Swiss-Prot record:
Gene that encodes the chain: Trnau1ap
Protein purpose: Involved in the early steps of selenocysteine biosynthesis and tRNA(Sec) charging to the later steps resulting in the cotranslational incorporation of selenocysteine into selenoproteins. Stabilizes the SECISBP2, EEFSEC and tRNA(Sec) complex. May be involved in the methylation of tRNA(Sec). Enhances efficiency of selenoproteins synthesis.
PANTHER family: TRNA SELENOCYSTEINE 1-ASSOCIATED PROTEIN 1, TRNA SELENOCYSTEINE 1-ASSOCIATED PROTEIN 1-RELATED
Keyword Cytoplasm appears in the UniProt entry: yes
Official protein name in the record: tRNA selenocysteine 1-associated protein 1
Domain of life: Eukaryota
GO molecular function: tRNA binding
GO biological process, one term: selenocysteine incorporation
Domain named RRM: residues: 3-86, 96-175
UniProt signal peptide: none
Any GO CC annotation of this UniProt entry: nucleus
Pfam families the record matches: RRM_1, Trnau1ap
UniProt keyword Protein biosynthesis, yes or no: yes
Amino acid sequence: MAASLWMGDLEPYMDENFISRAFATMGETVMSVKIIRNRLTGIPAGYCFVEFADLATAEKCLHKINGKPLPGATPAKRFKLNYATYGKQPDNSPEYSLFVGDLTPDVDDGMLYEFFVKVYPSCRGGKVVLDQTGVSKGYGFVKFTDELEQKRALTECQGAVGLGCKPVRLSVAIPKASRVKPVEYSQMYSYSYNQYYQQYQNYYAQWGYDQNTGSYSYSYPQYGYTQSTMQTYEEVGDDALEDPAPQLDVTEANKEFMEQSEELYDALMDCHWQPLDTVSSEIPAMM
């Protein structure tokens, strides 16, 4: 039975032939591509549905090429794929996530997924977080549909080797209460990994990750895992993922503060209070 994947972040010039060729370049054969367009303007909506021969082929393709560079794309883009719920009820089954830290730059989504799914069949997917240039930030997330397998993975794979060049560091990700807000149709299919708030502030310092250079130091104590294993996240699209320990841009912060201060001053000067002509001027009576 045929199965489809949702593909997003498309440019207007990316038509059915372009998408089919891109998958063929990656060694995947698609049955058809359906570009979704605005009903009123006819302009492409920025996403499509790609049909495969069966569910197994679609799943293999998702985990193999999701997040990899999109051949022929200008400007450079990456495959942004997800399971399609086109014409179906969305899957509301619970998910249990793990934060995976200390990933080396060679680890991609497919490698992260394969590392866990071969032992834990309920692993639904893996996501390595990238910066704006497409370089790994050194951490990612994996999702499970079985809570027991999530807990087993946390215990059994803590410090495990075989994923990249360093032992992996794991912690539990607990979802906060979801905010109810309207979303556009295309956003329903976004590959929704989550924004995580680190409960420990010195993650990169202890594990030897340099945020400025994206490089790793191997001088940290082996298995010195003293932080809390609990981390929380709030569900947002994967494009909104943030660095767990961002650096403060002092110059930009000062500039923003001064602009806000000037706006407040101008607002006060423009209100109904008028300056006195001279020091000896009388204060007008209240109307």
